[in-house]
């Protein structure tokens, strides 16, 4: 909760109520992890499953939160459809899971681990551009995203010369050219590359047609609508915490 006092003397008390539920899984026949740094949920009327990447077994673990059962789908490690260590995951459905790996490819995998589609993201990167799909919460989090309405994949990039960040949108059917959405720099620290080491990259997430992002060194939240190009920012400072 946050309690503050306005200049007129009135007290403002903002409380956030959180509801949590602990789910205990019994001992399983498969070797699952204690925690999954890469995971994506599937929710529906009769489905409540978390799919996580098991880096030890190079598999996708399906954790059913209702039946408390864990099933495993092994990812191909060799052959023409080989997948290396994952960098991102986005679950569209139980039978359609998009994953990105260290080779800068994105794969569409079904519930049996069969690769149904491959997208080479290197084709959409300029010579001086780096791909930033990452889920290291100590550094930054920029997720892989699949927009089902637009049939597209979205991911963060950075131009190494200009240091400008942009989200690129690649359309699966290739009927449209790649779309580029440039992120606004920080309102507080416009040049985030100077003196912030590994905390200079933005955290990026997606909700529908909105890109939501912030910079780890400050508390403002930024939004960009990819349809209307409308940009907004929320200066999340308080009486007790400055924006930096």
What are these regions (language model features)?
Residues 2-6:
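Bacterial signal peptide processing site
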Residues 9-36:
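A short helix->beta-strand "capping" segment at the edge of beta-propeller domains
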Residues 26-58:
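Beta-strand-rich domains and repeat architectures in extracellular enzymes and scaffolds
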Residues 35-44, 88-92, 136-149, 198-207:
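Structural signature of eukaryotic scaffold interfaces centered on beta-propeller domains
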Residues 56-58, 105, 159-163, 218-219:
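Short glycine/acidic-enriched loop and turn motifs that connect beta-strands
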Residues 69-103, 119-133:
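Blade-loop segments of beta-propeller domains
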Residues 104, 111-149, 156:
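Asp-box/WD-like beta-propeller blade repeats and closely related beta-sheet repeat scaffolds
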Residues 164-174, 223:
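Beta-propeller blade signature
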């Amino acid at each position: 909760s946050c309690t503050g006092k306005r200049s007129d003397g009135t007290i403002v008390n903002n409380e956030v109520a959180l509801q949590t539920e602990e789910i205990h899984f019994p001992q399983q026949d498969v070797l699952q992890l204690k925690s999954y740094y890469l995971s994506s949920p599937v929710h529906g009327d009769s489905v409540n499953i978390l799919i996580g990447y098991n880096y030890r077994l190079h598999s996708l673990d399906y954790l059913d939160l209702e039946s408390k059962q864990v099933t495993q789908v092994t990812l191909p490690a060799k052959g023409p459809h080989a997948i290396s260590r994952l960098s991102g995951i986005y679950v569209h459905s139980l039978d359609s899971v998009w994953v990105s790996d260290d080779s800068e490819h994105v794969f569409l995998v079904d519930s049996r681990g069969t690769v149904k589609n491959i997208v080479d993201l290197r084709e959409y990167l300029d010579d001086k551009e780096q791909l930033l799909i990452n889920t290291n919460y100590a550094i930054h989090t920029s997720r892989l995203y699949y927009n089902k309405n637009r049939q597209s994949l979205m991911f963060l990039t950075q131009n190494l010369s200009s240091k400008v960040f942009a989200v690129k949108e690649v359309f699966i059917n290739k009927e449209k050219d790649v779309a580029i959405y440039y992120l606004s720099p920080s309102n507080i620290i416009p040049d985030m590359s100077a003196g912030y080491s590994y905390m200079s990259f933005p955290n990026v997430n997606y909700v529908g047609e909105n890109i939501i992002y912030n910079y780890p060194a400050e508390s403002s939240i930024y939004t960009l609508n990819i349809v209307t190009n409308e940009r907004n920012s929320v200066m999340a400072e308080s009486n007790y915490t400055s924006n930096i």
